């Protein structure tokens, strides 16, 4: 195999065009086999193989800085930068990351996992280079989906204004996780589809691939191309922002990409945007046909589960509630399938809004809808809601608007690693006035909390984990839950276990283990982090000598913080022992493994409580 000879991009430069094409086929096969076994981002990586090879063929990494947006499409980059022998460990505990990780390789310059960061980071690299008097190229690779994010557009504005030597590669595959939406997507489609421009592109691309053409003709072709675009397009947006725009080019045509990249690298030292079009999922029949379903796939073990996921239960429950309440509207930030809102979109398309990768806009858009009498439900991953923190405070909670925030992927989220763990939401939402925060113990309680939230006249956040529910039977009706009311699941006397959300069932099982050891705990489903059930909790705290909190969230500021503060306010002289996640970023790994490592399964919870009780006796 050719890949066995590639230890670094320097080895890549020794290959012929035909060998590069053969290498691209080898890489696709490795990516497909690895992702089907380990899980990961399939469609996006299959779409960037040739683009990545051409980039590393022309630019001199790691001296030249290639800054990836999101980083989920960089598997080829990893394979040709010395990590091929470890690629089988992709997204596994202790293995290589599914994203860009500077601690992993000198070729990974900027840690990433969220969309829209590459242009700002690349501009920082470029300006630092200039101020230090250094000479190298900075290339940012961003997808058309990520380009819809506000941060990316802010960076485009600044890059053009500063007139910095920086190359932006726009990887246009017409998808982010789901098909792209908005005016930017329409604008890029206009660039791709103009018939006269497409004729011109076909002609010049054939010329560009001729290796005998010199730099002079290449430079002439680029100037001619730009002149023709100005005649064809009513509003060449990127040019107005201060970029020299070239494209669209076929992102799977290796000789063409090499010619374009070389020409621009050697001839230009200003802001340049190179527009390449790629096919998401190319090389895998099913992924090409339905790329959104193959954006990120689970491992083989994950595919065997039959119990419905929390995402499915939420999505179908919202459809039921949408039928009951015509004022309910649903909003997602480019993730209708991932959040379960695709069910609602199919049933109520006029009441469904996909705003693209624009979490800040999603929240304030919801605020406007709520202010005018509607009931918005904003479904978003826990890790991505962080991006709209100011909007939640300033535009929603300050006005106490009736918006339901549904936080999917809360807690440990397995193999995507530190950028995607949903372990901070209990902490960062708890400090905001007027916010109700709840976490269901199971999928049935999720349905009732959703019903309760939609009927609540203020901001209401519901968080739940990734993956299947616990398998309880779902009722065919909704029941309103009293705001702030906890639930005593098991009554005991020796120790008080206060658990929330995904930790309630493990706490109950831990209680069963303790009972077998002659220890009788009281187990409480706290359910509402805010407001707390103060009356019930005060009574329970006073009647137990040992208090344990259990949460799948960082200990700082979450359930432990809330209970410790309550005890202090009530002037109760008792100690609280926290079980939760430490003050660190949690690595990638299987959920069950990580819960074991961090003491969040029933066995480790029971073990910890036994240890605490033994220490108290001593």
UniProtKB/Swiss-Prot annotation:
InterPro entries (UniProt xref): Dxylulose-5-P_synthase, THDP-binding, Transketo_C/PFOR_II, Transketolase-like_Pyr-bd, Transketolase_C, Transketolase_CS
Keyword check for Lipid biosynthesis: no
Metabolic or biological pathway: Metabolic intermediate biosynthesis; 1-deoxy-D-xylulose 5-phosphate biosynthesis; 1-deoxy-D-xylulose 5-phosphate from D-glyceraldehyde 3-phosphate and pyruvate: step 1/1
GO cellular component: cytosol
Annotated GO MF terms: 1-deoxy-D-xylulose-5-phosphate synthase activity; magnesium ion binding; thiamine pyrophosphate binding
Pfam families: DXP_synthase_N (PF13292), Transket_pyr (PF02779), Transketolase_C (PF02780)
This enzyme's EC code(s): 2.2.1.7
Reactions mediated catalytically: D-glyceraldehyde 3-phosphate + pyruvate + H(+) = 1-deoxy-D-xylulose 5-phosphate + CO2
SUPFAM superfamilies reported in the protein's UniProt record: Thiamin diphosphate-binding fold (THDP-binding), TK C-terminal domain-like
Required co-factors: Mg(2+); thiamine diphosphate
Magnesium as UniProt keyword: yes
Segments passing through the bilayer: none
Coiled coil stretches, renumbered: none
PROSITE patterns: TRANSKETOLASE_1
A GO biological process held by the record: isopentenyl diphosphate biosynthetic process, methylerythritol 4-phosphate pathway
Residues involved in Mg(2+) binding: 144, 173
Keyword annotations: Isoprene biosynthesis, Magnesium, Metal-binding, Thiamine biosynthesis, Thiamine pyrophosphate, Transferase
Cofactor: binding details: Binds 1 Mg(2+) ion per subunit.
NCBIfam families: dxs (TIGR00204), PRK05444.2-2 (NF003933)
Matching PANTHER family: 1-D-DEOXYXYLULOSE 5-PHOSPHATE SYNTHASE-RELATED, 1-DEOXY-D-XYLULOSE-5-PHOSPHATE SYNTHASE, CHLOROPLASTIC
Quaternary organization: Homodimer.
Protein family according to the UniProt entry: Belongs to the transketolase family. DXPS subfamily.
Role noted for this protein: Catalyzes the acyloin condensation reaction between C atoms 2 and 3 of pyruvate and glyceraldehyde 3-phosphate to yield 1-deoxy-D-xylulose-5-phosphate (DXP).
Listed name of the protein: 1-deoxy-D-xylulose-5-phosphate synthase
Species, as recorded: Dictyoglomus turgidum (strain DSM 6724 / Z-1310)
Origin organism lineage: Bacteria, Pseudomonadati, Dictyoglomota, Dictyoglomia, Dictyoglomales
Gene that this polypeptide is encoded by: dxs
